[in-house]
């Protein structure tokens, strides 16, 4: 009995020492995922998601901290609704940008002048923002290291509440990095899928250790929860813009089979070349 009392007392002490809150979210819905290597705007639903998120953050959670945003149009547009409610500027942070994990053409990122033309008076360049901020292809491990490093730098520089607005991949890396700051076994990791505008909430003490938090999409209806053009929580046979779960599964299986075919084709070609050389030597 005493053991449980001590455990609960320790948890209560950690929670009471919560000094600030860190919020992490992904941009609102955009179109087909391959467009993510270019500058895409939010769809009508994406705008609605961003507005719902902003209202929840500012009106329900009373968020008043700084907003760090990946310098893509879709992330800035998502964060702009929260920024406007707070009447504050967004901080452009290339450290939480999205980078492809496979070889693709990497277009240059928008310059600050270009961003300012789209969002006049709403953004400021962060300390790490330069006009050549766009990164090239990187592995998952490289992304995790990059994002974790930037997170630690920002937490050291900014001691208030913070909202990060990133992408599916960079949000996952941010959440992993923050979960590693849990020191008590009694504090559970914050888990949840990075849907468009889903929200991860981390409570930190004055040593930047995570003492609690949660994941939520409560401010959006299930029908409005998306992974860009996919709508994973419910079937959408009535709307051709979205894949149903069955279509999604079939699409993934088709792509996996095609990728496997390319790999086996390369192996066959390699073996044929080797056999040809052997015959020539004979």
Sequence positions of predicted segments:
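Beta-strand elements within well-structured catalytic alpha/beta cores of enzymes
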Residues: 21-26, 68, 158-170, 174
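Phosphate-coordination/substrate-recognition cap region in phosphate-metabolizing enzymes
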Residues: 55-128, 188, 192, 200
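Active-site-proximal alpha-helix that buttresses catalytic centers in soluble enzyme cores
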Residues: 20-93, 136-144, 149, 252-254
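Flexible, surface-exposed loop/gating regions in the mature catalytic domains
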Residues: 118-141, 168-169, 173-175
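Hydrophobic h-region of N-terminal signal peptides that target proteins for export
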Residues: 9-17
